[in-house]
Amino acid sequence: VWYPALVPEDEVKLGQYTAVTRNPGITATLFGRAIRDAIPNTAAGSFPLIVISHGYPGNRYLMSHLGENLASKGFVTVSIDHTDSTYDDQQAFASTLYNRPLDQRFVIERMAELGKDQSHFLGGLVDAEKTGVVGYSMGGYGLINNLGAGFSDKAVNATVAPPNDLLAIHAASNPRFRDSLDPRIAAGFAVAPWGMLQTFWQSEAFAGIRTPTFYLVGDKDDTVGYETGVRVMYKAAYNSERYLLTYKNAGHNAGAPMPVPREILDSPTGEGADHYMDPVWDNVRMNNVMAHFATAHFNAYLKGDATMFDYLHVRRDEPAAAVGAVAAP
C-alpha cells in the first residue's frame, strides 16, 4: 500500500523492496521513493483508491513504479499479490480465470473497511467510493469483467476454464452477473487486457461497460492481440468514455513491467529477463509514459479535474506519445 504521507524535509532515505522475480530462484532488491511506515497525511482528508492487479504470473512489485507515482499525486494505491498467480506460487491457470475478478472486488471492499477503521493507519485516508483499477494482462481480464463485460459461454466451457461451469458467475448470460459488480469502480486502466483473442468475450459484451476506461497496448502484442484483440474491445465499448494508447512496435510487456532487476541481468543465464523487457522500447520510457496518462485519467475521472482532459486528448502520432485517441461520445 502506498499513500500520501508527511515526510520531514530532511528525510533523504529512499525505500527498498525485497521481491521475488520471474525467476523464483532470484530475489531482487528494488529501490523506490516511498518511505516505509511514513505518517499518513490525513489533514487533506481522504484520497481516491487505486487498485493495481498484475498478470499471470506476477506480483505486487511488478508495477510498484506506478503505485509510488500515483500515491505522490494524491491517491491511495494498493497492489495485489494474487493467490495461485505469483512467481513463487504459480498454480493452475483456471484458478486465475475464476478468481481474478473476485480478488479485485475483495481488495476494494477490504480497503474500504480499513479506511473506516480509525484504529488503522488507513483510517480516514481511503475514499473507496471513488475507486480506480489498473489491470495488466490477466489483471486487465479481471478489470474488464468487473467493468461490465461478461464472459462468453464459450469461455465458461473452454478447456482451460475451471470445472463445473464456475466461470458462469462472470458470464454475460448469467442474469445476476451485473448485480455482482462493484459500483465504486469509477475508472479503469486496462493494460494489454487478456481474453478477446482467446474468445473469452463476444464483441457485444463490451457495450455493457459504462465506466471511463483507458486501454494501453503494444501493436505487436501476440499474447492478447492488437487488431483482433484490444482494439476490438476498445471499439466495442461504445457506451463508455474510453481512450486507446498504442506503443508502436511493442509487445506484451508494453508499459507495465518495471525494468528488469539487476540480479537477473547479473545471473549466469539471465533467465526471466524477457518477462520484463520489450525488444524495442526502453522500460523506463514506457513506465513514464504510462504514469503520465494514468495520472491524467485518474485525476480527471476520480477527482473531477477537467484540466486533465488536455493531456488525454492528444493528436495521433505526436512525438511525445505513441498513438492517442480521444474519448468516444
Where are these regions (language model features)?
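Active-site machinery of serine-nucleophile hydrolases
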Residues: 4-7, 61-88, 94, 101-102, ...
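Alpha/beta-hydrolase active-site loop
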Residues: 62-72, 92-129, 142-148, 154-174
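Mobile cap/lid helix-loop segments that gate and shape the active-site cleft of serine hydrolases
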Residues: 20-33, 148-205, 211-225
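Gly/Ala-rich beta-loop-alpha elbow adjacent to hydrolase catalytic centers
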Residues: 135-139, 143
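Active-site-adjacent alpha-helix of alpha/beta-hydrolase-fold enzymes
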Residues: 207-286
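Short amphipathic alpha-helix adjacent to the substrate-entry channel of hydrolases
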Residues: 32-52, 57-81
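Domain-level recognition of soluble alpha/beta enzyme cores
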Residues: 2-50, 227, 263, 276
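Catalytic active-site module of serine/aspartate enzymes centered on a nucleophile-bearing elbow/loop
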Residues: 261-329
